[in-house]
Amino acid sequence: MGGILVTGGTGNLGALVVARLREAGHEDVRVLSRHAPVYPVDLLNGAGLDAAMAGAEVVVHCATATRGGDEVAAGHLIEAARRAGTVRNIVYISIVGVDEVPLGYYRSKLAVERLLEASGLGVTILRTTQFHDLVARVSGSAAKLPVVLLPKGVRVQPIAAEEVADRLAELAVPAPAGRVPDMGGPETHALTDLGRAYLAARGIHRRVVPLPLAGKAYAGFVRGGNLAPAHAVGKKTFAQFLAARGAS
């Protein structure tokens, strides 16, 4: 098997994927990021992509930017894969609800899905629910105020990033699988309840106040567009995530 590229390979998810691929015995795993020592690549302008892509057979595309640029980055990745002529499968990590919740970041992820599907290249797309880490970050940010304000009526189904990395490593094979079944966490809870659990685990004494919001994106979350109840395949619960994390 040829080389495997992991974009965003120094990020939280990408680093986990890289570790799993190497543990599985893959010798040519190429870590791509702007600051990677061997394959420094800037996806926003394509610099370094051709050298990194040479002879590669699989790409696991984990790189993303909440502030925009994902579509441009995907375009450069697709063109580099075409030039290389050896790439048989681009594995892309997406989000459950990108076609249900009109959030700017979600729209960008959906646009990348469509670019990949229209590229003529072999593609595998995995959508997952939000990571435990994201719920913890949202709760931690909200806890900086005297009263913790979290969106009212929003339910989440968080999943462990490690479990998603396991699945991405499984999918990183030359044969593309198209859109594969979604991955959701094992439990669904109100975000406010998980916020309270986070505060209790950290020993933070704050009152959580459900805050009603406006807009189509908020309505999409309230409708449950971000959930995958039929695909609750995750194992680690948010409570277990908090227990393993401790007070950090």
Predicted segments with their positions:
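Adenosine-cofactor binding site in Rossmann-like domains, unifying the SAM/SAH pocket
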Residues: S33-A47
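Conserved beta-loop-beta element that borders a ligand/cofactor-binding pocket
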Residues: S94, D99, A111-L134, G140-S141
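A conserved pocket-lining segment of Rossmann-fold NAD(P)-dependent short-chain dehydrogenase/reductase
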Residues: T124, R137-I159, E163
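Short-chain dehydrogenase/reductase
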Residues: T7, R67, E71, P102-L110, ...
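Mid/C-terminal beta-alpha module of Rossmann-like enzyme folds, strongest
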Residues: M1-I4, T10-N12, E162-S248
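NAD(P)-cofactor binding segment of oxidoreductase domains
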Residues: G46-I90, R107-A118
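SDR active-site strand-loop-helix element
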Residues: T7, L32-R34, C62-A63, I90-I95, ...
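N-terminal Rossmann NAD(P)H-binding glycine-rich loop of SDR-like oxidoreductase domains
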Residues: G2-E27
